[in-house]
Structure formats: C-alpha cells, structure tokens
A protein has these predicted regions:
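A short SAM/SAH-binding and catalytic strip from SAM-dependent methyltransferases
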Residues: 20-34
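A short glycine-rich, Lys/Arg-flanked "PGG" loop and its adjoining helix->strand segment in the class I
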Residues: 35-47
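Conserved beta-strand signature within the Rossmann-like core of class I S-adenosyl-L-methionine
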Residues: 48-56
Length: 106
C-alpha cells in the first residue's frame, strides 16, 4: 500500500528515524535552507539508512538562478559536503553526463 503525504522538507510530518531510504530527486536546488533542511532529512532517516540526491545540472549556458529566482544550483561536491557536515557518512558521488547522484548513510 502507498500512502501519499503532503509536506515540506522544512518540517516533515514524520517521526524520528522513520525511513530506511530518503530520496531527493530534482528538489535540492529549490530547498529554502539547505543546511537546516538536511538536518530534517537526517532526523527522519533511520540509523544505517540512506539519503540519495539525484539532480541534473541543466544547460550550463543558462543562468538558472536568474531565470528561476527560487533556485540555487549546487555542485555534487557541495551537496556531498553538506551531507557530511550534517552527519551522513560514506558520502559518495556518481556522475553521468549532466546527471549526478550523491548518496550517504546515517
């Protein structure tokens, strides 16, 4: 059974240590406060659970932040650093073309 819950990364409507896997696909660039929001992801991830971010860099010739004012682009390396600062371990990066994946474990 699948249950759809509406919420925000700013304050997720879930208990602590709830999920074995948390994903953020094409969303991190739009988070209002990345450091604070990563703490919220960490809170809902179980010990030993994983957090995976998948993003597309998009066309590098476009100034995305100007075109989409609520957007802040980060490199895979920046996101990996944010994850490590939050407490995720074994953070690693995989890239293919304009796509990147950053994964870490709690």
């Amino acid at each position: 059974m699948v249950k759809i819950v509406h919420g925000s990364v700013e304050k997720m409507p879930f208990s602590d240590d709830r999920f074995d896997l948390v994903t953020a696909i094409e969303t991190v660039f739009f988070w209002p406060d990345t450091a604070k929001n990563l703490n919220e992801v960490y809170r809902v991830t179980r010990q030993g659970g994983q957090f995976i971010v998948i993003n597309n860099y998009g066309d590098p010739s476009i100034d995305w932040e100007k075109k989409v004012p609520c957007m802040t682009r980060y490199t895979a390396e920046q996101i990996c650093g944010f994850m490590k600062e939050t407490g995720f371990v074994d953070a690693r990066i995989a890239k293919k073309g304009n796509l990147f994946c950053v994964a870490g474990r709690k």
